């Protein structure tokens, strides 16, 4: 680009002839770019001045000067906590090893002297025969049988502990040694636990207590098995009670005496069992449901029916009082009837001809038969 010569006062000295080789629009473009170049030059000079000023200030400031900013009085922080460093104390000298004290020797307690066990006695002495009773003591009759059965029942009830263990079992629990004994005269003894088959001769109805009999259906041999002590056909007499509890299915029968065909009589005092040896005799039980609850149910139904009919036949204003009075009366009658009949005991029926059993509860001595042909 060619500059035009100018005069000293800034004006053009003379007209510059345009160059015929440069087009007119190129001269116009250069004329428009000229202000931009001046602007860029001014910006570069300003930046250079700013940079030089910053370098001069950084060199003029002290090299290690610290700037401290003072906070306002309301925002000043409290002074920090001061710690004091104490010198380390010297470690104490180690203690010398001391021997351990020996354990004291305590005197040993002396063992207690052994206590000899108490002498054990057999519940039944088989070596000595039972003492004979005179004929007056062996009189038969309802009084003797009732007394024997009552004594047997009291003995069984009193001999049971609270936990259901019999008195004999409770006595034997504390015994540590059992000694065997030899029973003499086994040919004329029946041992406890002997089973006697019997056929019931009388019907049993437990509404009232009473007596019953049975006939021995099979010969019963002695403990040795050599002699028949209770022959077939022997009559056994016993007694039953009437206090059958609700829900019970068995009746207790106590057999008191044996009457042999030869005329010999012996006190038995043993309970009745069924064919399997279970205590008591089973039978047909009538729980009397109709007698216990029939009256109360009937009165309750009548009360409901009366209330229903009164509610239909009475007007709405007075029917409520009459209905409540009638219903309350019927309910009271039903409760009174139930209280009077709820405790009716059930009845057990045991037919005659049933096969039952007798379990001997104590040893029976038949030494009176010694020397006879029986």
From Swiss-Prot:
Principal location: membrane
GO CC terms, sorted: plasma membrane
Entry's transmembrane regions: 38-56
A Pfam family reported for this protein in Swiss-Prot or TrEMBL: TrbI
Annotated segments matching region Disordered: 87-116
Keywords: Cell membrane, Membrane, Transmembrane, Transmembrane helix
Biased composition (Pro residues): 92-116
Cellular localisation: Cell membrane
Membrane topology according to the record: Single-pass membrane protein
Entry's family note: Belongs to the TrbI/VirB10 family.
NCBIfam families assigned to the protein according to its UniProt record, in alphabetical order: T4SS_VirB10
The protein, known as: Type IV secretion system protein PtlG homolog
Organism, scientific name: Bordetella parapertussis (strain 12822 / ATCC BAA-587 / NCTC 13253)
Organism placement in taxonomy: Bacteria, Pseudomonadati, Pseudomonadota, Betaproteobacteria, Burkholderiales
């Amino acid at each position: 680009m060619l500059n035009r010569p100018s005069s000293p006062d800034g004006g053009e000295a003379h007209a510059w002839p345009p160059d015929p080789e440069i087009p007119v629009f190129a001269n116009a473009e250069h004329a428009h770019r000229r202000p931009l170049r001046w602007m860029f030059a001014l910006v570069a000079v300003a930046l250079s001045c700013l940079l030089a000023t910053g370098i001069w200030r950084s060199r003029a400031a002290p090299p290690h000067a610290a700037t401290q900013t003072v906070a306002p009085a309301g925002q000043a922080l409290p002074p920090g906590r001061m710690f004091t460093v104490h010198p380390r104390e010297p470690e104490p000298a180690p203690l010398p090893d001391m021997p351990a004290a020996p354990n004291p020797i305590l005197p040993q307690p002396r063992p207690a002297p052994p206590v000899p066990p108490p002498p054990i006695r057999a519940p039944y002495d088989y070596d000595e025969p039972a003492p004979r009773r005179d004929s007056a003591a062996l009189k038969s009759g309802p009084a003797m049988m009732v007394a024997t059965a009552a004594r047997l029942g009291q003995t069984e009830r009193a001999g049971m502990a609270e936990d259901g263990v019999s008195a004999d079992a409770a006595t034997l629990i504390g015994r540590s040694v059992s000694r065997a004994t030899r029973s003499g005269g086994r040919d004329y003894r029946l041992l406890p636990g002997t089973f006697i088959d019997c056929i019931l001769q009388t019907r049993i109805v437990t509404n009232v207590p009473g007596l019953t009999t049975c006939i021995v259906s099979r010969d019963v041999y002695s403990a040795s098995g050599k002699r028949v002590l209770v022959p077939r056909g022997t009559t056994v007499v016993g007694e039953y009670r009437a206090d059958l509890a609700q829900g019970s299915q068995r009746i207790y029968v106590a057999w008191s005496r044996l009457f042999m065909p030869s005329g010999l009589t012996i006190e038995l005092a043993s309970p009745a069992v069924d064919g399997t040896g279970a205590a008591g005799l089973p039978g047909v039980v009538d729980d009397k449901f109709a007698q216990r609850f029939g009256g109360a149910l009937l009165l309750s139904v009548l009360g409901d029916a009366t209330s229903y009919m009164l509610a239909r036949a009475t007007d709405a204003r007075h029917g409520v009082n009459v209905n409540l009075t009638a219903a309350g009366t019927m309910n009271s009658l039903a409760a009174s009837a139930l209280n009077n009949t709820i405790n009716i005991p059930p009845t057990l029926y045991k037919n005659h001809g049933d096969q039952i059993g007798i379990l001997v509860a104590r040893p029976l001595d038949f030494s009176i038969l010694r020397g006879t042909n029986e």
